[in-house]
Amino acid sequence: KISNEIKIAEAKYQKQLEELRRQEESKNNNGKNNGNGNSSTPTGSGYLMKPINGGTISANGYYSSGKFHGAIDYAVSTGTPVYAAAAGVVMSTANLSGSYGTYVVIRHANGLQSYYGHGTYGSICVSPGQTVSKGQQIMLSGSTGNSSGPHLHFEVRVSPYTYNGYATGYGQDSRVNPANYM
């Protein structure tokens, strides 16, 4: 029964993503041919917006110790609004005591997934399966989970989605540098 429910939910997500993909291609192309026929490869194109107003970058892929981090951390005050970096479908949300703490994961039409971690407990204002627009508020920043202070953990992954806790750089799992898509 659960397997069937998962298949139904996945089909629903795929339908929503396909509609978003069509809308984005229409908006991006404006009737023009971009030369390669593929408007969904956004390297450095501004596909993603900065998910938070203000804040300073406290980690950009690596911690100050040199250890790989795989995300951009924006140091901001607790309660700062966090926004969807691009249109997509909310895949999951949770309020965990460890790891990402309060987090949201959004799948985008081009195959990217964006992760927003360490939000304020109870501040998530979207639900799994919900379609969100670029710039829509999804939660408030905080310091939940494995966090050393108030900030937004902003991580981006590409399909197929894998995670390697021992990775020492981008390319060793599905995490990519978010700056390449902003």
Question: Can you say where each PLM-predicted feature lies in the sequence?
Answer:
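Terminal peptide-recognition signature
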Residues: I57, Y74, G88, G135, ...
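Acidic, glycine-rich catalytic/binding loops that coordinate metals and/or anionic ligands
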Residues: Q130, E155-M182
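Short glycine/threonine/proline-enriched tight-turn/helix- or strand-capping micro-motif at secondary-structure
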Residues: G54-A86
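Alpha-helical oligomerization segments with coiled-coil/rod-like character
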Residues: K1-P42
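Zn2+-dependent peptidoglycan hydrolase active-site motif and core
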Residues: K67-G70, A84-Q130, T144, P150-V158
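Short acidic/polar mixed-charge low-complexity motifs
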Residues: T80, N110-L112, Q172
